[in-house]
């Protein structure tokens, strides 16, 4: 810390506070501005595009300074938070009029990306999460907190791979890790990673602080007593939240134990490829959520996003949701609920801000309106006979006393902040009414005084006025000032006038100004009392908000089922996936032509479909729609199919499309192989696997070998697999693997032009139509003509020079010995001695890389 004796008293105060918050930008309140100094000022000037100036000198050097008006701070804070910065808000808490030396200041709040609660700093349709991890290479404890809702969960996870996939699903704004962990760990590649002292993760201290927070003797009631690593992480989160909020956290009431085994697991690649709530460009258009989410409230949209990203395997829960949707569809009952739900607003986040004691007047007005809408909503729910809907109705309840309290207390359209008053209704508090009357009647008193003084003095140019610096005054032009009565006391001299005060005006000033400040203080005290009364009802109100969000999602899914022609899927015990007339829910909405629906049948006898057909023929769409139908079924939704019957799945894997991972130093092919390896290691006989064009990122023979081996391994695993390929050699797989079948997407060629029919038919495709697709894409005609010449030559000589020709329109022989027989290389001898059935996919991959180094 710098030698404070060299600096001014105010800068000494600044350095002491800044020393306590070295990692945050310090917003230091000075009058109507937040000022930043030294390195903070330089950084803020660059990030916020504000002017960097200098303020005098301290310690013999000019002080770099940048400032922003306090009333427009929100916009600047939002920008800093989006950039991943944290800000310490330092306010004046002393009275400048009575302070000896610098006004007393203290940090009242720390705003970080993971702990923001202000409405203006949040995306209303996305959760804003804070996470912490503790553990080693084998087992990790993960804790997750949403301070804007009060949701607090823990789980224990095996291995980095599973942990990173879970972090990708959660996408926390901040991630806390122990400071004694080695540098360069995989988790540190994520945004918002902050290292915390190891003792913040102490498990005994964490257990004690969590029990204290929840008012319990132990954590057994939450089912996480033995999750010691996760409890250590949760303790760190709780301490961090208290440190940043500088207040109690009454809205954090419980801890939930999440279990991966309860969910359908999707890795990061699968989530990206299926474009659940973010498309491949990073936007939200044309995603699954953009089609199925028409929720009335923001809190329901956030719940919908959580459902989509964390499908369930609990059949009882899923069927209860289905039953609720069916009930809401009967006689279009959802239409009676949705207008009422729209009145509820974002109750979840409003209640969190009340718990944090930073709720604004408009939050209380929205809560008032929400509570007023509950009785009508309850009446609309009385006819809903589905058990789950009845349980939600019971949880929602009504709060007539709170509704009446807020209706009496808060004006219809309150200001944004309590700072200047004008929030509490007249008639709510007699003392406030009296003080406000004194202040409001000042105008009439001054008019009466001016008229009386004009009459008494005979001076027609006399005026009575007020300004914030000098208070009330009587003003006379300079030429008439000498005629002022003896009881006029000179207060201020202006260029062309003199200002006076009288004992009567001074007495009124003392009373009026005192009344104004006392009225504001009284109003703020009443507002704080309101918050305290609401905090006393926080637990049932939060339960109601959760139930209302779920009701909104279910009503939304009923509306979507009606308007998107979705039907109820049926879960069965025996292993199968049967879809009749399935459709892609997103593609269907953006097409200008009717979508071609297709069937799919996988069961105990058929576990894999090898899908062939032309590029643009619809293979990827067919695969993705299958995954989306299965996923929608596993959130309890109806699905885009005429009929769907399925068993529960444990994972959904997709290997569809790849691009270079430049940041990670991985080529497209390496990304593809990493995704393939993940699938081969983790798929089970209850998984759904989509494999699109495996092996296309390398040479023909390498790619074919890998695709073949991967398909065989998945066939042995008996995972439900859709395997799209342009390697026609793979269409002979059903001969050696009885659980494999061929299907193809059909097309036809007319006058050298291709027409895609998009129907899925049994059997392999007859040709690939590659040149026709190239022509359709606009490849120049001379290039297409030259390509046809090359194709004719290759069809007679094959690859690379001397391979036997094949009949046009028939698949090449799939036997690898034939394909490689003409290549004079030692690797072929080794390959001929290997039985593919005796080696694992991993061994095949290692051999392939070794051979490639030698070729």
Curated annotation (Swiss-Prot):
Molecular function as annotated in GO: ATP binding; ATP-dependent DNA damage sensor activity; damaged DNA binding; mismatched DNA binding
DNA repair among keywords: yes
Gene Ontology terms describing biological process: mismatch repair
Protein residues bound to ATP: 613-620
Gene Ontology annotations for the cellular component aspect, listed alphabetically: cytosol
Keywords carried by this UniProt record: ATP-binding, DNA damage, DNA repair, DNA-binding, Nucleotide-binding
UniProt-listed PROSITE patterns: DNA_MISMATCH_REPAIR_2 (PS00486)
Highest taxon listed in the record's lineage: Bacteria
Cross-referenced InterPro entries: DNA_mismatch_repair_MutS (IPR005748), DNA_mismatch_repair_MutS-lik_N (IPR007695), DNA_mismatch_repair_MutS/MSH (IPR017261), DNA_mismatch_repair_MutS_C (IPR000432), DNA_mismatch_repair_MutS_clamp (IPR007861), DNA_mismatch_repair_MutS_core (IPR007696), DNA_mismatch_repair_MutS_N (IPR016151), DNA_mismatch_repair_MutS_sf (IPR036187)
Pfam families to which the protein is assigned, alphabetical: MutS_I, MutS_II, MutS_III, MutS_IV, MutS_V
Region feature Disordered, mapped onto this chain: 796-816
Keyword ATP-binding: yes
PANTHER family for this protein: DNA MISMATCH REPAIR PROTEIN MSH1, MITOCHONDRIAL, DNA MISMATCH REPAIR PROTEIN MUTS FAMILY MEMBER
Family: Belongs to the DNA mismatch repair MutS family.
General function of this protein: This protein is involved in the repair of mismatches in DNA. It is possible that it carries out the mismatch recognition step. This protein has a weak ATPase activity.
Protein's name in the database: DNA mismatch repair protein MutS
Organism: Pseudomonas aeruginosa (strain UCBPP-PA14)
